[in-house]
Amino acid sequence: MTDLIPLEQAHCLPRKGSDHKLGEARLAELLPQVPGWELAEAGMALTRTFRFPDYCRTLAFVNALAWIAHREDHHPDLGVHYDRVVVRYSTHDVGGLSENDFICAAKTARLYDQGITG
């Protein structure tokens, strides 16, 4: 699906059932496309910590990320702290990671890299 266009330009599709859970080979293909992200929980989740100079910019990032999550209908778990946000993606309906997680990880990284909050 996302092999033809960059992940950050793709859009999430409804995914339910274990048929959409990514296997180890596909995870190995997609992970290099989202630098800075790590597999967590034995490959069941994708995580990354984003750092900010102050709380205002931290919350600006969270609010911008909320808009992306709403638009894609794919929502991360967030750990919000004064100077950082821990973002965790996993697709509960497939019991692990789906392509939607990588699409949203790429969009999240682009948001951060573009300096939307600063």
From Swiss-Prot:
Known EC number: 4.2.1.96
GO terms assigned for molecular function: 4-alpha-hydroxytetrahydrobiopterin dehydratase activity
SUPFAM superfamilies: PCD-like
InterPro entries assigned: PCD_sf (IPR036428), Pterin_deHydtase (IPR001533)
Leading EC class: lyase
Entry annotated with the keyword Lyase: yes
A UniProt-annotated Pfam family: Pterin_4a
Keywords carried by this UniProt record: Lyase
Reaction(s) this enzyme catalyzes, per UniProt: (4aS,6R)-4a-hydroxy-L-erythro-5,6,7,8-tetrahydrobiopterin = (6R)-L-erythro-6,7-dihydrobiopterin + H2O
Protein name: Putative pterin-4-alpha-carbinolamine dehydratase
Organism: Xanthomonas oryzae pv. oryzae (strain PXO99A)
